[in-house]
C-alpha cells in the first residue's frame, strides 16, 4: 500500500502546488468552463499566486499538501477565514485539488480530515466551501455531510458560471465522519 503524508506547505512548494492546481483545474473543468475562459490559468501565474499566499497569508490562510511515497506533491487543500461574512460560517475551504491519478482513493478525505483538525485547532467552529455547481466535487462534500447553503453567479474569464456553497455548521460533525 503506498504511503501518503500530509504536511504544512512551505514557500518552496509553490511551483509544485501550482502544477497540481493547473493540471487538476484543466481536467476537472474541461467540460464545465469555456476553453477561452480557462486560458489565463497558467502554471506561471498560479506559481506567483501560491508564492504570495505562502509568503504573506491573508485571512489566516494556510495550505496543506499531500505527498506520495516519493515525496511528490499530488494534492493540496487551503483555507482560512470565511470571506463573505454573509452566512454565519467562520471557516472556509478555498481550494482542494488532487492529480487525476490520485482521485477516488480516499485521499481527498485524508486532506479534508487533516484540514478540519487544523481548523479546529485554530479555533474555527464551522466550515463553508464554494464549488462550481457543475463540478462533481459537490458529491464529495455531500458524502462527508456538507449541506447546501447558497448558490451565486461568478465570473471566470469572460464567462459567467454558477457556484454553490456547501457547509458544515459544526466542524465536529465533519470530524466525526472520519471516526465512524
What does each model-found stretch correspond to?
Residues 1-15, 172-180:
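Conserved N-terminal entry element of GNAT/NAT acetyltransferase domains
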Residues 11-12, 22-32, 38-101, 112-114, ...:
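Acetyl-CoA-dependent GNAT
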Residues 106:
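Conserved G/P- and acidic residue-centered "switch" motifs that form tight phosphate/ATP-binding loops
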Residues 119-130:
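Conserved GNAT acetyl-CoA-binding A-motif
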Residues 128-132, 142, 147-164:
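Conserved catalytic-core motifs of GNAT/GCN5-like acyltransferases
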Residues 137:
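Helix-turn-helix
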